[in-house]
Amino acid sequence: MFAVIKTGGKQYSVAADDIITVMTLQGEPGDAVTFDSVLMLAGEGEPKIGAPFIAGATVSGEIVEQTRGPKVISFKKRRRQNSKRKRGHRQDLTLVKITGINA
């Protein structure tokens, strides 16, 4: 059985025991999280599609790690002006292990 959930403005297709990387969620490693925004359930019989969400369906998970993504460099230069700017950015991320899908 798999589900499509929405968190952090993005959609993720998940199944039990998957580890997904999502935008930062509050909590420490080992804490339980519940995703209520379930868009689709499939795998057993007819697939269920929400409009926009499926009432009563949840996906539970456990925070594995709070981490940061790779460094992204932003570089701007104005030609012939001896003017340039270099900035770096690392996005905060959370690794979540999916423990169950509750229809």
UniProtKB/Swiss-Prot annotation:
- GO biological process terms on file: translation
Record PANTHER family = 50S RIBOSOMAL PROTEIN L21, LARGE RIBOSOMAL SUBUNIT PROTEIN BL21M
Q: What is the lineage of its organism?
A: Bacteria, Pseudomonadati, Pseudomonadota, Alphaproteobacteria, Hyphomicrobiales
Is Ribosomal protein set as a keyword in this record?
Answer: yes
Q: Got a GO cellular component term for this one?
A: cytoplasm
HAMAP family from the xrefs? Ribosomal_bL21 (MF_01363)
What the protein does? This protein binds to 23S rRNA in the presence of protein L20.
InterPro entries (UniProt xref): bL21-like, bL21-like_sf, Ribosomal_bL21
**Tell me, what is one Gene Ontology molecular-function annotation carried by this entry?**
structural constituent of ribosome
- Recorded family membership: Belongs to the bacterial ribosomal protein bL21 family.
Protein's gene:
rplU
Q: Which SUPFAM superfamilies match?
A: L21p-like (SSF141091)
* Residues that span the membrane, as ranges: none
Read off the Pfam families from this record.
Ribosomal_L21p
> Can you name the source organism?
Beijerinckia indica subsp. indica (strain ATCC 9039 / DSM 1715 / NCIMB 8712)
This protein's UniProt keywords: Ribonucleoprotein, Ribosomal protein, RNA-binding, rRNA-binding
| Protein name per Swiss-Prot or TrEMBL | Large ribosomal subunit protein bL21
Record's subunit section: Part of the 50S ribosomal subunit. Contacts protein L20.
